[in-house]
Amino acid sequence: MQLNFLLFVFIFLMVFHLNIFNKGKRQNLVSAYLNHFKKSYFSGVTSGSDCVNKSEVSSDNNNNNNNNNNKIAHNFFSKKYQRNFENNNLSENQENNKNIIYSGSNIFKNIYNTEMMSNNNTVDVNMMDNNPAARLEELRTIMKKNKIDVYILINSDEHNSEIINEKDKKIVKITNYSGADGILIVTKDKPILYVNALYELQAMNELDQNLFTLRISRIDNRDEIFETISSLEFNTIAFDGKNTSVVFYEKLRKALLNAYPKKKIVEKIIYNNNFDDVNKKDDENVLNFLVLEKSLVEIKDYPVNNKTLYIHDRKYNGACAGEKIDKLKQSLMYDIKNVDNLLLSELDEIAYLLNLRGYDYQYSPLFYSYLLFQFDREEQDFSKIVFFTTVKNLPADVKNLLEINKVIVKEYEEIVPYLRDVVIPSIPKHNDDNPDFKKYDISLSPYINLMIYKLFDRKNVLLQNSPVVKMKAVKNDVEIDNMKQAHILDGLALLQFFHWCEQKRKTKELFNETEMSLRHKVDYFRSTKKNFIFPSFSTISASGPNAAVIHYECTDKTNATIKPAIYLLDSGGQYLHGTTDVTRTTHFGEPTAEEKRIYTLVLKGHLRLRKVIFASYTNSSALDFIARENLFNNFMDYNHGTGHGVGLTLNVHEGGCSIGPVGGAPLKKNMVLSNEPGYYMKDKFGVRIENMQYVISKEITDTTEYLSFDDLTMYPYEKKLLDFSLLTNQEIKELNEYHTTIRNTLLPLVKQSPQEYGESVEKYLIEITEPIAIHNN
C-alpha cells in the first residue's frame, strides 16, 4: 500500500513538473530532462554516501547563485543583446526574448563593479587610450628614472591563467596587440614582442612595426627569447613579480649566467615600487634582477567581481571535496615524502579539489585563490589547510563546506605575508646529509609567480606539478556521463545555429550578417540550453581569409560581412554538466576543388586519430603524427597542437594530457582531449575540424592494455566540402556511423520539443546526417 502510494506521488510530481515546464514555456528540453533524469542527476549519488558534506549532493537550488535550469544564462543574456533576431522556429519563450542578444565583449557587466587604482611609479593606462607611442615613451621615462635598462612584460597573471582579466592586459595597452600570448622586452631601443606562432597573423595586423620588432616563437626556436635578452647590454632588468613564472625566470637566469659567467646576479624584491634602497651604482660585474611587487604598467580601472562562489554538485563531478582531499593526502603519505608543505596556485586545481566554482573570469568558472596544505608526518594527516580568497564572496553553504573539511579561510592578499611571516619561520632546518633523500621546504607549481617563489631559498623549493593535475585529468564515470550530456546540449545549440544560417543563406539574408552577429547568434542558442553558464572561450567566428588566422577574434575593426565562402566556427560552452569545445568548417557558397581537397585531407587525419588503437604505454606525441600524415604527404602542416585536455566546468584548455609534436605522456582511460587538425592558407581561407573525445579501454591482454577514443561531440561534418575521391570506403563507413549516432541521439530530443525546434530543424538534421554512398569500385 505504502509503495503504491509513493509510486502515485512520484508519477503525479513528474506530470506536474512537465506541466509547469510547458505552461511556463521554459527553454529547457523537457523530454530530455525526463529521459536523462536518473543518469544525469543521480548517477553515483546516494543519500547514504560517505561524503562529509551533505550539501554537495543537494539539489541545484541550494546554491546561493541559483545556477539551475539556465537561469544564469538568462541573467546574462537578457540584458546583453541589442539587435533583433528574426523568428526562426524559436519556442514562444525564445520569441518573447528575441530582442535579446549576447555581447561577448563584456559578459560580466552586471556582476562587476569598477575600482580605481593608482600608483606613483607606474604608467597610468586609460582603458580607452589608443596611443602606443606615448605610452611607450612614458614607460621608458619611468625606467630611466629608476635605472632599469630592460623591462619584461608577460601576458599572464598571478596564477598562470591562459585567458587573463582586464587588470593584467598590459601588453595590449602598450602595443595594441590583443592576442592572449605575448612577451614584451622593453629597452631604450626598439622594443621586441615575442608571440606564439598561433598569433602571428593577428600580431602582424595589430602591431605598429615602426615602433616594435615582432618575433615569432615556434616549436624549433622556443628558447630564442632567452638568447635575445642575453644579447642585450644592461645592468638592471626588472620583472613583474606577480605575472612572471618561475619557469621563465629560471631559464633566463641560466641563459645569462652562461652568457656572462664572470658576472654576479643580485636579486631583490621591490615592494610598492620603492626603489630607494636599490643599489643604483653601475657595476659591470653585477646584473641586478628586480622582482616588482607592482607593475610599472598600471590599468587605471578594471572590473572586479562581487558575485559569490557556489558548490559544484557531486551529481556532476562524482566525488566530494573531502574525498578529493583524502586522495591528495594519500599522495603525500606514500608518493611525496620529501616535502610537508604544498601550495596550490593553479586556479582550476583549487576549484576542482574543493568542488567550488566562481565568476572571477569571463570564460572559466574560477576564482582568485591559493590553497596551502601543511602535512604532519607523525599524525599522517594535514595539520592545516589554508584557503586564501575573497572572503566576502563566500556564502553560508560554501563556508559550511570549508568548515566541515577543516579549511581555514584568509583573505587573498594575505598569502605573501602569511608565507613569509608564519610558514617560513615554522619550517624546521633539514639535515641534508643523506644524498638519496633531499628534504624540501615547500612544493610549488613550476609556473608559480616570482613573488611567491622568491620568498623561499630556491634550493629548498620542490618545483613540480601537484598530484591534483593527474587527479582532474582522469575523469570518473559520473564526470564522463555528464560530459556526454553537455555535448548533447551543445549539439542541439549548433543544430539550431547552422539551421538558422542555412535558412538565411537560401534567402541571401545571411550575407547581410557579420562575423560578430553570427558569434552572438551561436552564443545565444547555447544560452537557451539547460545548465548553461557562459561560453568556454571567446567564440571564433571567421569568414573567408579570416579563417586562416588560427586564434582569430572578430573586433569592430576586423568584423567582416559574411560572404559565400568558407566559414569557420570554433566555439564552446560552460555547463554545470561540463565544458565543451567544438570546431566546424562549412561553406556558405560553392566550394572550389582546392577547398574540398584541403578539407578532406584535414578530415582524413581527424578520422584516423578518432579511432586509432594504441598501447597504454604510448607517448601521446606519437599520436600527433597520425593526424598530420595525410597533410605531410602533400607537404602541408598546421602550426598548433592536435589535442588538449578539457576540464569539467573548469578550463577549456586543461593540463595533464595533450597530443602534440613534442612533449606528451601516456594517456589513461577517461582522459578527455580534443582532436583538432587543420590547415591555413594565408589571405585565402582556413580549415579546422575539432571533436572532443575521451579515452576508452579497447582490450586488455596478459601484458598490455590497448586504448582508443570515443566521441563526445555530437555534430556532423560538412559533406559539401568533401572530395569523395580522396575518401576510402572505410572512412565513408565511419562518417556514416558517426552521423547515424548523432541523428539517433538528437532527433528524439528535437521531436520531443517542437516549440523549441520545429519541423524545419528536424528535416535539416535528417538532411545533414544522410548516409554517404559507398564507392562501387
Swiss-Prot record:
From the UniProt record, give one GO term of the biological process aspect: hemoglobin catabolic process
* PTM: The N-terminus may be proteolytically cleaved to generate a 73-kDa mature form.
Cofactor binding: number and manner? Binds 2 Mn(2+) ions per subunit.
Binding-site list for substrate: H551, H640, H653
Reported cofactor(s)? Mn(2+)
Q: Does the keyword rRNA processing apply?
A: no
**Cellular component, GO annotation:** cytoplasm; food vacuole; vacuolar lumen
The UniProt family comment states: Belongs to the peptidase M24B family.
Q: Subunit comment for this entry? A: Homodimer.
Protein name (record): Aminopeptidase P
Its source organism is: Plasmodium falciparum (isolate 3D7)
Lineage, top ranks: Eukaryota, Sar, Alveolata, Apicomplexa, Aconoidasida
